[in-house]
A protein has these predicted regions:
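Glycine-rich loops and low-complexity Gly/Arg-rich segments
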Residues: 101-104, 121, 172-175
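Glycine-rich, Trp-frequent "lid" loop and neighboring beta-strands that shape
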Residues: 86, 126-176
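Amphipathic, small/basic residue-rich leader segments at the start of a protein or domain
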Residues: 1-114, 125, 130-134, 138
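FAD-binding core of FAD-dependent oxidoreductases
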Residues: 107-120, 141-152
Length: 176
């Protein structure tokens, strides 16, 4: 392949034919299962004092949309590994992520919301068998949520390589 042919291929920003039906299914899922519950979800949460918790009824609404997503095979497709995800390229996922970004509940309904997506990808790529069993499996199943902290005093928080905090096991407890 010549340099010009390689460059032409790199400039092709079209979604693959393989991913187009998935995009159509995602749009349909959002329209039929997420959009109809969104106003009620946020209405139910209006009076809660803690922004990090759910008000009664919110999780039930979201679980209904998640159940439909699972039934329709719209679950964890952001992962590039075809065994745990859909095997999409970053470009194909970008088209889908653009649709997910139009709805405040769409990503969560498909188990594709941050920080879980990044944490699952890290666990999938470099996690130990024990870490995958303990954390990746329940994350992939949508049974737990995860977190990633990367803001520190006097440290640029946009690049995880700059993190200086450490955790040391002392007397059976982790000291941060």
């Amino acid at each position: 392949m010549s340099h010009n042919e390689a460059m032409a291929g790199m400039n092709n920003l079209e979604m693959s034919e393989k991913a187009k039906p998935l995009l159509a299914a995602v749009i349909k899922h959002i329209r039929e299962n997420v959009d109809p519950i969104t106003d009620e979800y946020f209405r139910l949460g209006e009076g809660r004092a803690d922004r990090w918790s759910h008000a009664p009824g919110q999780l039930e609404l979201l679980e209904t949309a998640k159940k439909k997503a699972r039934e329709n095979g719209l679950w964890n497709f952001f992962l590039p590994n075809a065994e745990t995800g859909e095997g999409l390229s970053n470009l194909d996922y970008a088209y889908i992520a653009a649709e997910l970004g139009k709805s405040p509940l769409a990503s969560e309904s498909l188990n594709c919301s941050a920080p879980d997506t990044g944490n699952m990808e890290v666990l999938e790529r470099i996690g130990t068998a024990e870490q995958k069993e303990k954390w990746l499996k329940p994350l992939l199943a949508g049974e737990i949520r995860s977190a990633f902290a990367m803001t520190e005093p006097d440290m640029a928080s946009s690049d995880a390589k700059n993190i200086s905090t450490s955790a040391v096991l002392e007397n059976g407890e982790w000291v941060i």
